[in-house]
Curated annotation (Swiss-Prot):
GO terms for molecular function: ATP binding; magnesium ion binding; phosphorelay sensor kinase activity; protein serine/threonine kinase activity; protein serine/threonine/tyrosine kinase activity. PANTHER family: HPR KINASE_PHOSPHORYLASE, PROTEIN YJDM-RELATED. The Walker A ATP-binding motif also binds Pi and PPi. ATP binds at residues 153-160. Catalyzes the ATP- as well as the pyrophosphate-dependent phosphorylation of a specific serine residue in HPr, a phosphocarrier protein of the phosphoenolpyruvate-dependent sugar phosphotransferase system (PTS). HprK/P also catalyzes the pyrophosphate-producing, inorganic phosphate-dependent dephosphorylation (phosphorolysis) of seryl-phosphorylated HPr (P-Ser-HPr). Homohexamer. It holds the Pfam family Hpr_kinase_N. Its cofactor is Mg(2+). This is HPr kinase/phosphorylase. The keyword Magnesium applies. Keywords: ATP-binding, Carbohydrate metabolism, Kinase, Magnesium, Metal-binding, Multifunctional enzyme, Nucleotide-binding, Serine/threonine-protein kinase, Transferase. The active site is at 138, 159, 177 (proton acceptor), 243.
């Protein structure tokens, strides 16, 4: 099922429906828009009929120069069964030929008071967000010092309890248990919570709590870009864990690779503080300050100096 239909654009952007009401449930499957200027001149070989069509001042001014026969021909060619809608911008008058073609084809004809450039930008941003590839991940998403940290791990390892401690320390909860992730752009993942469990946190033995009610509106966020993954796992004595931080592990979600840190869990470890420091250290690395790399370089210099002596 398509995620966006023409009626969604009408509601989102307060568009005026001129005609073609029977077609407002037409699907929109691409975020690309079309301004059919070359089509107005009669070239329809590569006409992208499946896109939302925008008619601005330039297109309609040129349209006025055509003969009556050409006007009818061009508008019939524009209004296809595939076309989600045609939007006339700047509250311009709708040509009679376009109105007639819309009625005959059942294609929605809409009008907006916004300029073509402004409406085009807003439509593109809206459609890219709605049509972006999506997935769901079992975990907790928290905004820590501006870093979107996705905490993963097997059930019962302590993800929600750690998130609760982070919220108490002033950070913001985005989602618990199920994180809906959409790829809004290349290398850009945005996580949010399903509407049903938004702002809720499940603590074993305590039950479900409403974080916004308990800690205030400043303790939650509706969405956050994900830049770091921290995986919690029960401490395995046979496994060698990274002790320097030189090797950077990656995790792929949809088509984006994220930095992943594995934290072993055992009694006595304050996971909330460790995750806080991991987020701050991640920010430092992005700013060009890598403590592990600096230590490694100092160590190599000391070894070389010792060998020379």
């Amino acid at each position: 099922m398509p995620k966006v239909r023409t009626k969604d654009l009408i509601e989102q952007f307060q568009l005026e429906l001129i005609s073609g009401e029977e077609g407002i449930h037409r699907p929109i499957d691409t975020s690309d828009l079309s301004r059919p200027g070359i089509e107005m001149a009669g070239f329809f070989t590569y006409y992208p009929a499946d896109r939302v069509q925008l008619l601005g001042k330039t297109e309609l001014t040129f349209f006025d120069t055509l003969t009556s026969e050409q006007k009818q021909e061009r508008m019939k060619a524009l209004c296809t069964e595939e076309t989600p809608c045609i939007i006339v911008t700047r509250n311009q008058d709708v040509p009679d030929e376009l109105l007639q073609a819309s009625r005959e084809s059942g294609m929605p004809l809409l009008r907006s008071s916004q300029t073509t450039t402004r409406l085009s930008s807003r439509l593109t941003n809206y459609l890219e967000g709605k049509l972006a590839p999506t997935t769901a991940v079992h975990g907790v998403l928290v905004d820590i010092y501006g870093v979107g940290v996705l905490i993963t791990g097997q059930s019962g390892v302590g993800k929600s309890e750690t998130a609760l401690e982070l919220v108490k320390r002033g950070h913001r909860l985005v989602a618990d248990d199920s994180v809906e992730i959409r790829q809004e752009d290349e290398d850009m993942l945005v996580g949010s919570s399903p509407d049903l469990i938004e702002h809720l946190l499940e603590i074993r033995g305590l039950g479900i709590i409403n974080v916004m009610t308990l800690f205030g509106a400043g303790a939650v966020r509706n969405y956050k870009r994900i830049t770091l993954v921290i995986n919690l796992e029960i401490w395995d004595q046979k496994k060698n864990y990274d002790r320097l931080g030189l090797d950077e592990e990656k995790m792929k979600i949809i088509d984006t690779e994220l930095t992943k840190i594995t934290l072993p869990v055992r009694p006595g470890r304050n996971l909330a503080v460790i995750i806080e420091v991991a987020a701050m250290n991640f920010r430092l690395k992005r700013m060009g300050v890598n403590a592990a790399q600096q230590f490694s370089e100092r160590l190599m210099s000391a070894i070389e100096l010792g060998n020379q002596e």
